[in-house]
Amino acid sequence: MKTAVIEEKWWGGVCLNVGCIPSKALLRNAELAHVFNHDAKTFGISGEVSFDFGAAFDRSRKVSDGIVKGVHFLMKKNGITEIDGYGVFTDAKTIQVDDRVITFDNVIIDTGSQVRLLPGVELSDNVVTYEKQILTRELPGSIVIVGAGAIGMEFGYVLANYGVDVTIIEYLPRVLPNEDEDVSKEIAKAYKKLGITILTGTAVQTVDDQGSQVVVTYRDDKGNDGSITVDKVLMSVGFAPRTEGYGLETTGVALTDRGAIAIDDHMRTNVPGVYAIGDVTAKLMLAHVAEAQGVVAAETIAGAETMTLGDYRNMPRATFCQPQVASFGLTEAQAKEEYPNVKVSKFPFSANGKALGMGATAGFAKLVTNADTDELLGGHLVGDNVSEMLPEMTLAQKWDLTAKELARNVHTHPTMSEAMQETFHGAIGHMINL
């Protein structure tokens, strides 16, 4: 098929330029700083070590730029036309980019999302979103991060390990509020060890950038008022689908109650030939979900055999602080609301040989199953690089493997993944090493 991509700013998207990729580079530097700052004695390391955030920043940009160049290479290799500019629909079969008019048979809308702000809060030099912060080479002395989701927690980890005084304020009762409650507790404990101040159940009232400092006032769930003065504020309270400003209304495409583009299982909108993927659909605002949706949309347009994605709750999720968080499916609380008999199996990394050898005993593997059928309902991991372990669980869930079948899958010893095998055993009887 003859194919073109229209992009105004970030070839490769937010992920490659100011999101997933550069943040992982910064997190890797922060992990190394954490080892020297907190675990040097454990590993027999002594002496003075300095940490240059500017060098970490430069490395993150180099990594990002390299992958973006790879995107351009792949576009050229596959004969895809690149169109630089801002595209605006004039109808469901036409887009105008500056003076250029582009017609097509099919279109995939992948316009992403935009940062949500609290009412009354305005961005400024010192009140910023993730995009400005990840493109800033200098560190503040202190920062308030508003929102304890994945982005807020990842930035908190990086900045704290480079000596920034970090306070995280979350309106809901716990950090990572969409994760299992045990996960939230474990991460809150780890962050407090880092010296990060966490205020949950707390609503930000005002954010006042006074030039040399920012004053944040807040009220907790007991009605107590407080304030904090910092160098900078990072707003990370969530995202909204980007559906305005590019003529979507001229296409007749329907929106959901959340303001997202409504799609079916094949990413089709209500308008023939118009598809949508990614954050603009608000199914699950993660890069790998957008990629998976894109594959389904492309295969559908081409008339090729495809496989729909099913329940988006079963998509893998991760937060890349250390210890990392990785999960899929239902939390324990959600499972107990939906199923009459739920089994929970949990194995701590403190009882895992590889974790002990690595000095990475924080966290656990937790499995939630249907006690009547051994069906996997959810998996929740906290620990060193556990995001790499999650695909075993999501693959098993996708192909309807039970805990009993998974318990017979031999895991390499010694590996962190043996903790998952223990949860499989625990779900059907008893664990071996606990």
Residue ranges and their predicted role:
Residues 20, 111-165, 169, 197-198, ...:
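Glycine-rich dinucleotide-binding loop and its adjacent helix/turn
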Residues 124-140, 227-304:
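FAD-site-proximal beta/loop scaffold in flavoenzymes
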Residues 1-9, 14, 21, 25-35, ...:
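Flexible, glycine-rich terminal cap/loop adjacent to redox cofactors
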